[in-house]
Amino acid sequence: MHKVAIVGRPNVGKSSLFNRLIGRREAVVADFPGVTRDAKEGLMLYHNHRITLIDTGGLWSGDEWEQAIREKAEWAMEGAQAVIFVLDPREGLSAADYEVADWLRRLGKPVIVTANKIDSQKHEPYLAELWGLGFGDPVAISAEHARGLDDLMDRVMKYLPEDDEDVPDIAPIRISLIGRPNVGKSSLLNAITQSDRAIVADLPGTTRDSLDVEWDYGGQRFVLVDTAGIRKKPDTAIEDFAIQRSQAAIERSDVIWLVVNATDIGDHELKLANLAYDSGKPVIVVVNKWDLVPDAELKSTEKDLNQKLHHISFAPRVYTSAINDYGIHDMLAEAMKLYEKWQSRIGTSELNRWLEVWQMKQRVPNFHGKPLRMYFMTQVETAPPTFAIFCNRADFVTRAYEGFLQNRIREDLELAGVPVRLKWKEKGPYKKGEADED
């Protein structure tokens, strides 16, 4: 697949261009510099050509992240066949722009100088100065207004090799990592991909943006989404936006990794667990930093996990250490297993055999001596598996009984680990407002 990197100093519109080209809002965009710290990937289709775009952090930012961001950008360059060098010519060329240009020359990749924020022809005189960078004719665009993007991509295509033979497209499993800041999400992502795609530090909230990273495991394609940590009280506008992004990442995922610190589970984790459960997506609780738990405290830590995450007790757990690569492959193997179950369908005859045996063996709820009777069961949806149960009185079904029944369905029908939904439909001799008699 073709790869193209987008580079430039902070706040010249790299992420706006990235979002415009891939057709959705992936990177955090704001009016202050240094918003994108990590290199993130997105897929675009241009005239039937599949292109992976890599959006890099702002180079020569002059802050504590400068060296780490440059290293991520260099990683992005390794597989890129062309580079889109984004500048804001209205501000004039800065020393940082010239440093980026010198750095690009040393890398030896084809470079397309891209003058962003050229919203009309009256701004085009600003382009003259860009010739001095030595990369040829600049392309004028406005990412915000989608101006000049075809000209830009036509120039990019000149540097890309001919496509190989078509390869059958395997639908990827999209997995989001959610968790509070500094719980180890980015370290886990780096351990899985065997790279340093996400910046890792000891500061909360290091990853502000969501990173989409494609990866293969066991013949299966994955898209790993590393979200910004959700905080209870955001202290800046960007953290507030990161909360929304984390929630949105859950919705566009197939499987959710809820990453928790083995020794510190609080209200943040409960909130995230509720969000994950409500989404109907399979949840895997990733207990990170397990290697830091003393042997004498393993049982008590496990008990604490059971108590605090009891409402998603059906969710499987994987115990990991990103530093030691412990449990890393189990995360992906479990995700593949749950994804398959999540989309499974069970035949109606099998369901009703199970329902008949269940009612013979188990006590059912009753109201004033009148029992709940379940006549028929069928699966009406997948992802998550959703079952309609036809009964005499839906109002006899308590929340506790429904939860009990969901657990038994998971246990008996090979749906362990996935959320199950039930829809109750009234049918038969008992109707609300009628006599409760046989």
Swiss-Prot record:
GO terms for molecular function: GTP binding; ribosome binding. Keywords: GTP-binding, Nucleotide-binding, Repeat, Ribosome biogenesis. GTP 2 binds at residues 179-186, 226-230, 288-291. GTP 1 binds at residues 8-15, 55-59, 116-119. The keyword Manganese does not apply. PROSITE patterns: G_ENGA. Residues 344-428 form the KH-like domain. The keyword Nucleotide-binding applies. InterPro entries: G_ENGA, GTP-bd, GTPase_Der, KH_dom-like, KH_dom-like_a/b, P-loop_NTPase, Small_GTP-bd. Residues 2-164, 173-343 form the EngA-type G domain. One of its GO terms (biological process) is ribosome biogenesis. NCBIfam families: GTPase_EngA (TIGR03594), small_GTP (TIGR00231). Belongs to the TRAFAC class TrmE-Era-EngA-EngB-Septin-like GTPase superfamily. EngA (Der) GTPase family. PANTHER family: GTPASE DER (PTHR43834:SF6). GTPase that plays an essential role in the late steps of ribosome biogenesis. Associates with the 50S ribosomal subunit. This is GTPase Der. It comes from Deinococcus radiodurans (strain ATCC 13939 / DSM 20539 / JCM 16871 / CCUG 27074 / LMG 4051 / NBRC 15346 / NCIMB 9279 / VKM B-1422 / R1).
